[in-house]
């Protein structure tokens, strides 16, 4: 098996819904990786949520055995990578494990923003790229137009593009021949000392952590003592193998191969993706380039709707963390919502997926506070802080300046929706950097504050472009900004869970919208309830929920006026006491609806 010239390591790059997982299914079927009765749609997407949303979240790998037309047997290692921007780092290290890529483009839709980001990463990794145009059987397919578009935008030669329909299986053998003939084999091993790239890891209840690796130099075998270079932790390898996509145990993984190993590792957090694995006795001198720890970008609070579920939530988060090292959380408490967790995510899709998995896999009913980002605070006394929880924001008098993160967004949109998209970006405080046309699609590059993106930007972009716009972003810089903490008071009590950090120009509009929303959601009481929005000590908006009138005289039929007066005085005293000590219960539904307000 140590014939490197017969190995091909490749990944599939595609935008969401362009047919990446379907093509992977056809390749597995064609090479006999699974029997026809074992095939299911999107074999490599192991989570239900991946199949339902049509997205890939975790990188998966599969070894295919293909007998080519030249008579040789080739071993093809397919790396199915995530396509969404939140998982860009997972994509980058999956690409680093390969020598080539299949660029799959939907011939009815053309190039999307997401595809661009991943193709440029593949080119940076010196990948050979084979262009595959999919969905050829659809009436709206325009392969020649899409080829021209790809040449104009990406600049790669499209004359040898492979035309296929993954769904109906047309052209799959052409794809396999192109992989064998056009993609290069792994480079010859330069040393016998083990050097392997940690591509991904997940938790198996029986084996502990399973680690996906690409062996660059040397070999990895059972009972070897290995060392992770980023964490300096040492383990003994228990099992070595590969996926077809079933698990196969083998004795050794040679240079150029992609496979997995287990080593009684207890948690995924110990396995940093992109780390270098080497032999403990003879370590390699230099780690592989490109490793960087993943830092959360978006934060929010997760609280159980029923406080008795707290321990269940704690256990569930710990289990999710086993499989997702980029997800972080810490305990926090709120006077309005009780005890919960402050969680950090790679982006909004990551947040949605974690939320959905908590409710689906662990049967939890949760309240999510408004998402926020990391702000840099420069204090007057010279201290510098980084905060992501509005409750931690110091008094404005003590702050010298505040900085917020900005992103660089690339948006591809059909010509007729351009006006609506430009006005949305302007409304979100965006600055246009570039604007170009490719055929009948516009490509615009905007600089936008991340704070404005985390609410509802993606949903609104999709609705104002009828779903045709695609959007990709990367972190750019931190810039000084006029930010304020918008507080919500109910009966003069601050509701910390509804506090947010907003730009001063948006504070009044957002404060009014929240007050109006809460007025409709909080049930009436026997006293007037004041709902106020404030910046510091200044009230910027107010709504009042009028009191219910409880008729205490209904049981007095006629009779003495002093009896009625006595009852009215008693009610008056009770209302006074309620105003003094009364705690207004805000229902959970009010929180959930108020937090969904975005920037309506």
From Swiss-Prot:
<dbReference type="GO" id="GO:0005886">
    <property type="term" value="C:plasma membrane"/>
</dbReference>
<dbReference type="InterPro" id="IPR027417">
    <property type="entry name" value="P-loop_NTPase"/>
</dbReference>
<dbReference type="InterPro" id="IPR006297">
    <property type="entry name" value="EF-4"/>
</dbReference>
<feature type="binding site">
    <location>
        <begin position="17"/>
        <end position="22"/>
    </location>
    <ligand>
        <name>GTP</name>
    </ligand>
</feature>
<feature type="domain" description="tr-type G">
    <location>
        <begin position="5"/>
        <end position="187"/>
    </location>
</feature>
<dbReference type="InterPro" id="IPR004161">
    <property type="entry name" value="EFTu-like_2"/>
</dbReference>
<dbReference type="GO" id="GO:0005525">
    <property type="term" value="F:GTP binding"/>
</dbReference>
<dbReference type="InterPro" id="IPR035654">
    <property type="entry name" value="LepA_IV"/>
</dbReference>
<dbReference type="InterPro" id="IPR035647">
    <property type="entry name" value="EFG_III/V"/>
</dbReference>
<dbReference type="Pfam" id="PF03144">
    <property type="entry name" value="GTP_EFTU_D2"/>
</dbReference>
<dbReference type="GO" id="GO:0003746">
    <property type="term" value="F:translation elongation factor activity"/>
</dbReference>
<dbReference type="GO" id="GO:0045727">
    <property type="term" value="P:positive regulation of translation"/>
</dbReference>
<keyword id="KW-0547">Nucleotide-binding</keyword>
<dbReference type="InterPro" id="IPR000795">
    <property type="entry name" value="T_Tr_GTP-bd_dom"/>
</dbReference>
<protein>
    <recommendedName>
        <fullName>Elongation factor 4</fullName>
        <ecNumber>3.6.5.n1</ecNumber>
    </recommendedName>
</protein>
<keyword id="KW-0472">Membrane</keyword>
<feature type="binding site">
    <location>
        <begin position="134"/>
        <end position="137"/>
    </location>
    <ligand>
        <name>GTP</name>
    </ligand>
</feature>
<comment type="similarity">
    <text>Belongs to the TRAFAC class translation factor GTPase superfamily. Classic translation factor GTPase family. LepA subfamily.</text>
</comment>
<keyword id="KW-0648">Protein biosynthesis</keyword>
<dbReference type="InterPro" id="IPR013842">
    <property type="entry name" value="LepA_CTD"/>
</dbReference>
<keyword id="KW-0342">GTP-binding</keyword>
<dbReference type="InterPro" id="IPR038363">
    <property type="entry name" value="LepA_C_sf"/>
</dbReference>
<dbReference type="Pfam" id="PF00679">
    <property type="entry name" value="EFG_C"/>
</dbReference>
<dbReference type="GO" id="GO:0003924">
    <property type="term" value="F:GTPase activity"/>
</dbReference>
<dbReference type="InterPro" id="IPR000640">
    <property type="entry name" value="EFG_V-like"/>
</dbReference>
<comment type="function">
    <text>Required for accurate and efficient protein synthesis under certain stress conditions. May act as a fidelity factor of the translation reaction, by catalyzing a one-codon backward translocation of tRNAs on improperly translocated ribosomes. Back-translocation proceeds from a post-translocation (POST) complex to a pre-translocation (PRE) complex, thus giving elongation factor G a second chance to translocate the tRNAs correctly. Binds to ribosomes in a GTP-dependent manner.</text>
</comment>
<keyword id="KW-1003">Cell membrane</keyword>
<dbReference type="GO" id="GO:0097216">
    <property type="term" value="F:guanosine tetraphosphate binding"/>
</dbReference>
<keyword id="KW-0997">Cell inner membrane</keyword>
<keyword id="KW-0378">Hydrolase</keyword>
<dbReference type="Pfam" id="PF06421">
    <property type="entry name" value="LepA_C"/>
</dbReference>
<dbReference type="InterPro" id="IPR031157">
    <property type="entry name" value="G_TR_CS"/>
</dbReference>
<dbReference type="GO" id="GO:0043022">
    <property type="term" value="F:ribosome binding"/>
</dbReference>
<dbReference type="Pfam" id="PF00009">
    <property type="entry name" value="GTP_EFTU"/>
</dbReference>
<dbReference type="InterPro" id="IPR005225">
    <property type="entry name" value="Small_GTP-bd"/>
</dbReference>
